[in-house]
């Protein structure tokens, strides 16, 4: 196993521990708590994949961070902060909408790279809105936290989420996953629209009303793809 992979995991575990202590003091805002919850799942998945104990890794990560801080000057810290581009966290959903459990009568699921696409194929003839929480850097989607499909009544009928065990995805990965989700939902004569935030950063080929134009052949192909891979 590559030593950099192990040390990276150890540092991530310790930094998560620090953030958790911060959150336990009720100092974190909604985006902070959201990322904390997602990163916990990611660390569990990575730990399982690597065969490493999280508690042991956290202690090792603490030693690495302490050594770095001991060698770091205030001036070097200022230069590092100034040179790192800042990302923005954008939210369509409330914390309640993100954490709410939902159930599918006719579940369909597809794994596309490091993203998991889920939808309820029992939903028909509904107006559906796609909402997402994600970070943006250089005016492009950086990391998808969670995307969900909501009916006008507020029911959740679809979802795109990163797989904890496979971190890392591009804005194109997210766009392709959105296309698959839309194709599956529109197959049952649902009308799907995308939030303004998603239109701007993750789905630029939308119509003015926020409804992505998908040809019938593409919709059928996407729906068949989902069914064949479940």
Curated annotation (Swiss-Prot):
Compartments (UniProt record): Host nucleus; Host cytoplasm
Region (PABPN1-binding): 223-230
Molecular function GO labels: protein serine/threonine kinase inhibitor activity; RNA binding
GO biological process terms on file: symbiont-mediated suppression of host cytoplasmic pattern recognition receptor signaling pathway via inhibition of RIG-I activity; symbiont-mediated suppression of host gene expression; symbiont-mediated suppression of host mRNA processing; symbiont-mediated suppression of host PKR/eIFalpha signaling; symbiont-mediated suppression of host type I interferon-mediated signaling pathway
Region annotation (RNA-binding and homodimerization) ranges: 1-73
Subunit description: Homodimer. Interacts with host TRIM25 (via coiled coil); this interaction specifically inhibits TRIM25 multimerization and TRIM25-mediated RIGI CARD ubiquitination. Interacts with human EIF2AK2/PKR, CPSF4, IVNS1ABP and PABPN1.
Biological function: Inhibits post-transcriptional processing of cellular pre-mRNA, by binding and inhibiting two cellular proteins that are required for the 3'-end processing of cellular pre-mRNAs: the 30 kDa cleavage and polyadenylation specificity factor/CPSF4 and the poly(A)-binding protein 2/PABPN1. In turn, unprocessed 3' end pre-mRNAs accumulate in the host nucleus and are no longer exported to the cytoplasm. Cellular protein synthesis is thereby shut off very early after virus infection.
Name used for this protein in its record: Non-structural protein 1
Source species of the chain: Influenza A virus (strain A/Seal/Massachusetts/1/1980 H7N7)
